[in-house]
């Protein structure tokens, strides 16, 4: 009573196959597709009894990964979705329900994890291994974004990004990367071809943090201020809110070192160009005394972790606001489908909606781009949060 189709990811192929299946299968047979991004509504458009057509999107490797996206098209019957959820639960899987929109839940909400890494690489903020170490070892993601695209396959990852970008009418949040396109054109597809962002034919060296600062700045006067600011003698160590260290140093007339989110053993910093060398070294010394491995990148608004996480949260809120899936299902999908350390909406509540809003507004101001515009649900939650605080 169930068919699961896993043909090539081309709409015309799937439409033809489903039209044939509808002719030969009894009317009660559920017709499902394992597509990762093609519209269920489009696949079912010419099928007899389209209410029995739905998506069952498994994640690789399917025997191991628990998540299944149960996707309804415009005509899919509610009882069909219910049956599929019960069935996947009986297989030991965890279903999440979503409507047929580009990328469903996971392939849509995960796009900023890749796109922000490509942007950092394009702007020569840091080497690939530093970008990956910051997200992996500093934020708790299971793999860095660039090494993950090498593992997925640059051609596959790039094709999904292009598909989502075009399906959303060239929405700038999903803009593909020219650097990734060059890799695909050049046949550097990642681990499967031996070359991608990394050379997989050779053993990769572990990322090493900055050398230990030997100068003894002790005793230092350290005072933790509010909102992520630590005063170390005359130096301000500021957790990023989307401004560059240089802009802050000029405005505050003080040496400034900006630090990314300090959740793990690895922390990433950026220093204002106007800083005396001793001021930056003092901040590094302070962090190393806290047992942190310190990585330094170019002065970059929002840094690596904060801007990536903020964009993921913003995308999850946009999907929630537009009825793609429930809050619980979005969080479950991202934890089980791509092993994020937290569901993005729970993460947003933990980090603070006002802080995320402020960071995105600062990024939008810095770049003058629609890419970083906060969704209206983020604004609503930030306003509600400020009301509770007052």
Model-derived features: positions:
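NAD(P)-dependent Rossmann-like dehydrogenase/reductase catalytic/cofactor-binding core
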Residues: 93-100, 112, 123, 128-390
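Rossmann-like dinucleotide-binding domain for NAD(H)/NADP(H)
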Residues: 64-67, 113, 120
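Residues immediately C-terminal
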Residues: 5, 9
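Conserved anion/nucleotide-ligand pocket segment
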Residues: 91-94, 101-108, 117-120
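Rossmann-fold NAD(P)-binding glycine/threonine-rich loop
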Residues: 10-87, 231-289
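N-terminal Rossmann-like NAD(P) cofactor-binding module of classical short-chain dehydrogenase/reductase
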Residues: 1-4, 237
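Rossmann-like dinucleotide-binding cores of NAD(P)H-dependent redox enzymes
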Residues: 72-77, 102-110
């Amino acid at each position: 009573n169930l068919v699961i189709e896993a043909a090539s990811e081309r709409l015309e192929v799937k439409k033809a196959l489903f039209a044939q299946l509808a002719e030969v299968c009894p009317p009660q047979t559920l017709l499902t597709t394992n597509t990762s991004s093609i519209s269920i509504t489009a696949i079912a458009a010419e099928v007899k009894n389209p209410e029995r057509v739905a998506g069952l999107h498994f994640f690789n490797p399917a025997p191991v990964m628990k998540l299944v996206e149960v996707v309804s098209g415009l005509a899919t019957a509610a009882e069909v979705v219910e049956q599929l959820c019960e069935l996947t639960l009986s297989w030991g899987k965890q279903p999440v329900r979503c409507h047929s929109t580009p990328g469903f839940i996971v392939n849509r909400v995960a796009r900023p994890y890749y796109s922000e890494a490509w942007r950092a690489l394009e702007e020569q903020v840091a080497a690939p291994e530093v970008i990956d170490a910051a997200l992996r070892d500093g934020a708790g993601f299971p793999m860095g974004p660039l090494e993950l695209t090498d593992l997925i396959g640059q051609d596959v990852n790039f094709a999904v990004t292009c598909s989502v970008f075009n399906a959303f009418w060239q929405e700038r949040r999903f803009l593909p990367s020219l650097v990734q396109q060059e890799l695909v054109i050049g046949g550097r597809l990642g681990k499967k071809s031996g070359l991608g962002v990394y050379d997989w034919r050779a053993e990769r060296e572990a990322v090493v943090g900055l050398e230990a600062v030997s100068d003894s700045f002790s005793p230092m006067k350290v005072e933790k201020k509010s909102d992520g600011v630590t005063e170390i003698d005359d130096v301000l160590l500021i957790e990023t809110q989307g401004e560059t260290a240089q802009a802050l140093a000029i405005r505050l007339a003080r040496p400034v070192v900006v630090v990314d989110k300090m959740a793990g053993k690895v922390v990433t910093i950026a220093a204002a160009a106007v800083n005396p060398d001793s001021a930056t070294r003092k901040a590094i010394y302070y962090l190393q005394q806290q047992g942190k491995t310190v990585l330094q990148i170019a002065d970059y608004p929002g840094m690596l972790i904060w801007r990536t996480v903020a964009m993921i949260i913003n995308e999850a809120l946009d999907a929630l606001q537009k009825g793609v899936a429930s809050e619980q299902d979005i969080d479950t999908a991202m934890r089980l489908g791509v092993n994020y350390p937290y569901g993005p909406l729970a993460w947003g509540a933990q980090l603070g909606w006002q802080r995320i809003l402020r960071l995105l507004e600062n990024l939008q101001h810095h770049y003058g781009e629609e890419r970083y515009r906060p969704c209206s649900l983020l604004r609503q939650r930030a306003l509600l949060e400020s009301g509770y605080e007052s």
